[in-house]
Amino acid sequence: MDLEAARNGTARRPGTVEGDFELGSISNQGRNKKKKVNLIGPLTLFRYSDWQDKLFMLLGTIMAIAHGSGLPLMMIVFGEMTDKFVNNAGNFSLPVNFSLSMINPGRILEEEMTRYAYYYSGLGGGVLVAAYIQVSFWTLAAGRQIKKIRQNFFHAILRQEMGWFDIKGTTELNTRLTDDISKISEGIGDKVGMFFQAVATFFAGFIVGFIRGWKLTLVIMAISPILGLSAAVWAKILSTFSDKELAAYAKAGAVAEEALGAIRTVIAFGGQNKELERYQKHLENAKKIGIKKAISANISMGIAFLLIYASYALAFWYGSTLVISKEYTIGNAMTVFFSILIGAFSVGQAAPCIDAFANARGAAYVIFDIIDNNPKIDSFSERGHKPDSIKGNLDFSDVHFSYPSRANIKILKGLNLKVQSGQTVALVGNSGCGKTTTLQLLQRLYDPTEGTISIDGQDIRNFNVRYLREIIGVVSQEPVLFSTTIAENIRYGRGNVTMEEIKKAVKEANAYEFIMKLPQKFDTLVGERGAQLSGGQKQRIAIARALVRNPKILLLDEATSALDTESEAEVQAALDKAREGRTTIVIAHRLSTVRNADVIAGFEDGVIVEQGSHSELMQKEGVYFKLVNMQTSGSQILSQEFEVELSEEKAADGMTPNGWKSHIFRNSTKKSLKSSRAHHHRLDVDADELDANVPPVSFLKVLKLNKTEWPYFVVGTVCAIVNGALQPAISIILSEMIAIFGPGDDAVKQQKCNLFSLVFLGLGVLSFFTFFLQGFTFGKAGEILTTRLRSMAFKAMLRQDMSWFDDYKNSTGALSTRLATDRAQVQGATGTRLALIAQNTANLGTGIIISFIYGWQLTLLLLSVVPFIAVSGIVEMKMLAGNAKRDKKALEAAGKIATEAIENIRTVVSLTQERKFESMYVEKLHEPYRNSVQMAHIYGITFSISQAFMYFSYAGCFRFGAYLIVNGHMRFRDVILVFSAIVFGAVALGHASSFAPDYAKAKLSAAHLFSLFERQPLIDSYSGEGLWPDKFEGSVTFNEVVFNYPTRANMPVLQGLSLEVKKGQTLALVGSSGCGKSTVVQLLERFYDPMAGTVLLDGQEAKKLNIQWLRAQLGIVSQEPVLFDCSIAENIAYGDNSRVVSQDEIVRAAKAANIHPFIETLPQKYKTRVGDKGTQLSGGQKQRLAIRRALIRQPRVLLLDEATSALDTESEKVVQEALDKAREGRTCIVIAHRLSTIQNADLIVVIQNGKVKEHGTHQQLLAQKGIYFSMVNIQAGAQNS
């Protein structure tokens, strides 16, 4: 059972919070259904606040309470003032013929009003200070805490053990790091201050009500318990749905990140639509949840407003009774009514704050759960033994092991192995038998389930984890380089290494020569996952990185598998030298590389069945003997033909020209060359680069995306206008009510009051429907827009050409971050926010119209302050927009570092570079933090000005109002009407200004999204243009093709390459690492177009053929195959996305690739998930799946780039036979370093310096005694050494 496949499994851990949002194994679904929605406690959300943050929050809260108390206190002043006016009303009934007796009361009234104006101004000054401190301090505290949460979360991820990553998968963690922490940031900042402000307004309103008129307050409060209950239900519903919505978006984010990370594979197999469907499926789930949330929340909201208006009706009726019976003055009744009114309306204004806080609690549950998860193997721990010296004696004693993700499948079943200090031990055996697992256990990436592993007689569990890993150097099968310079990549081996030591290590690894040919030499950027370099070049840098550690123990897992013949011979010599004095464990499928090992251990089914030297094991005729026999048969012809001494050949022909050592960049089929002109500062993403050439977008353009939902907007806007107009309508009723309490018959007064009370009840019933419809329609339209934006953005990304993905700014991490944050920020200014803005605008607009009708002079005075509020709003928007832009760039830069570290966590851990990545990440968080500090002050100042102007305008209003009344220009009731209409309007305007930060962010994000939507790629994967030939024979011609990668125009790759392969022929491309072989494959796939010359298929230029048709004719198997985190069956079926591939066909394909028996041993067989990038499978198993994936599309042309390099001997033989069979009747282009696999090719082409130097059959090229002859000679010599 070749079951090393389980080694990096991603089956999900049962019984943990992550189950709520994971891609999830079927076995956990039942458990997850039973689980409750998880939220953390409100105070726990602030667990990362230090004394300074707590001080900020305390002062911010105190000031929020002071700010919130301002309006109810103002109502006391208003009540007293109303009594003054009503008492004096009889004196100012006539507009003309003033008598001397009227002048004195007029002067007294004006003096009284001046006193009240000072009260208002005093309150305004207090609010100016309080509002600034409230907003700025809460924003400052949030910025500081978010920085700490990001740091702690990233630190927690880096310290987890490998078994945790196997269960979790890495892609969702990146989504959590961007999306979820943004939600926490939204929930713990200024919105908390605004919540306390609203709560203070609520309580202050009721306290004032009780003091001024407890009877009336109690009557109004009778309805409050029902109101409170509906608010509680509303909050609960919101948080439940928010949690589910988060989970759906996390899944969508994981799909997007996976597809963007494997973009070449997606495009080559035409999988864009399939990825888009997978993505949209999760988005649809999120949308449905969002719509349900909108319905539930807004029914609660409608009920709340119905209850509020019902309480007003009751208040008016009872209040009028109290005034008529002389228990209350009209001023008292007004104070009580207005205080309760303002207090009750503050509940509605708290709604977005409660929503944001609920989202934050849901997001924080998952984040804090990960932070609190204590790993059993903690690489940050200082505990454990750190010996002064290590000899390097290793002992594996009865080691049993199963991967945590697949506890029921045993990998090692009693491994026993002793390695003496300085010895080299080679582990051999079939793919998936447990060899790599052994190396992982030695590094303590996992702990054995039974048995012990010791170094120098000490159990490795007693060593300090970091110390243990530092004495071990690792070179793995698929080396991971980081997106920085070559020198920095080598420095990851050991932090304090000098440049001289780097050069020494590079020379030992045979990489010095190719590095010195690069324009930037050691400062050349290697691209994401080392994509600028060929496989061989990456491998040599990885070897240099291991050597620079000067490790006591060296672990080589297929360290030379990706090298060409010449490099392999030289690197092998370097490794032999490096092994001197070190304990070395080697895994190699190419057995010629391990025959000089001191001990060779034969693995079979998780145990060592034999060990000894090469000659001893050959005599035993066991596992090793069988493997050697199978492997040597392939290269026998070579060894028979070359008994000649290589030195003689060189002397005779002057061969092995320097030319074929050429190290011009080749791009491994994963990604192309990316620009390195810019050195280190490119890593920081040039400050202006991200937003250069991104034109600003009008918000109408965003709304146009919602035009199909126009009926929702029409209904929502009408309802918002009605809701906005309801409040000024109350102003008219109020002024009429005050007018009733002049002189007159009490029975008539009571009758009129009853009528107005019924009007209020009617408004309540109306508001139930209008508030529900407003919230629901805008909410639904917002959810649809969100889904559409995300879907369009992802679709637009998948449409782009390779040169766009080669750009450093468009790395997987940056794109995933952009996909999550841009959508969230645009949604932040649409949907329910848009509804509130429409409502508040209608409120102010209606208020102004009514005010002009009843008193234009006073209205003009009040409106004269509006420009000041507007200017402060505009300044706020501009400054916040600048901050949003800087913030976005800095967070994307941090996101890239995090994504790279998380995706390559095994390499980071092996190199003990967790601290380095953490410090890089923390450094990138400084700028967003500095921005948040600036933003706090800007936002605080502008917010406080807009809030305080309201009070100053009231001071002016009533002072001027007194003058107008005294001079007979207005009646008191009209002053009240104008005042209250403008009060409600100004409150609304104040709340509208609080959305400025969201709007600033949304504008920037919208600009980014539209620049992406509108970008026309040079090669459009979605294009329907071009020829669709009925028949394709399969002949391929390259005519004088010249090509440089777009991002490095000064580095020629192909320089006039011409070659032809006829229908059904097999063409083999050979040449040294980096000579342009894979570039040929990429041009054929039309990842790029040649700069000069043509690529022809059946005589037709590739550019003229429809791109989808063209790629459908090609099947590709690359050097490092990329599998997707879905089932084995789905991965095989991915080969042909134009149809539904049947299960029978999938099984037949698996049998043909010799992987069916292995799949049958798995618990879920073909439904087994292969893990992130296929990490549950061994290299050989992945490669076999990739071959079947390519063949299932029945291509006319088969492209094999090192298709068998990762296979063990036994698998290689079987797969090679399968490939030989697959080639029948097909045109085949093969790239191979192992020349024994291509000797039967119809045509072998030797590429050097981007041109064809030799071509012919195996025999013809041998006869020429040229470059190919030398390559074969070296390889045959290595095979027989």
Curated annotation (Swiss-Prot):
ATP 1 binds at residues 406, 432-437, 477, 1179-1181. Residues 57-359, 713-1001 form the ABC transmembrane type-1 domain. It is a multi-pass membrane protein. Residues 625-649 are annotated as: Interaction with HAX1. Translocation activity is inhibited by the ATPase inhibitor vanadate and the calcium channel blocker verapamil. Translocation activity is enhanced by the addition of the bile salt taurocholate. Glycans are attached at residues 91, 97. It comes from Cricetulus griseus. Its EC number is 7.6.2.1. Belongs to the ABC transporter superfamily. ABCB family. Multidrug resistance exporter (TC 3.A.1.201) subfamily. The modification Phosphoserine is found at residue 27. It is an enzyme of class 7 (translocase). Interacts with HAX1. May interact with RACK1. The chain crosses the membrane at residues 51-73, 119-139, 189-210, 218-238, 297-318, 333-354, 714-734, 758-778, 834-854, 856-875, 938-958, 975-996. This is Phosphatidylcholine translocator ABCB4. Residues 1-24 are annotated as: Disordered. GO terms for molecular function: ABC-type oligopeptide transporter activity; ATP binding; ATP hydrolysis activity; ATPase-coupled transmembrane transporter activity; phosphatidylcholine floppase activity. PROSITE patterns: ABC_TM1F (PS50929), ABC_TRANSPORTER_1 (PS00211), ABC_TRANSPORTER_2 (PS50893). Energy-dependent phospholipid efflux translocator that acts as a positive regulator of biliary lipid secretion. Functions as a floppase that translocates specifically phosphatidylcholine (PC) from the inner to the outer leaflet of the canalicular membrane bilayer into the canaliculi of hepatocytes. Translocation of PC makes the biliary phospholipids available for extraction into the canaliculi lumen by bile salt mixed micelles and therefore protects the biliary tree from the detergent activity of bile salts. It is found in: Cell membrane; Apical cell membrane; Membrane raft; Cytoplasm.
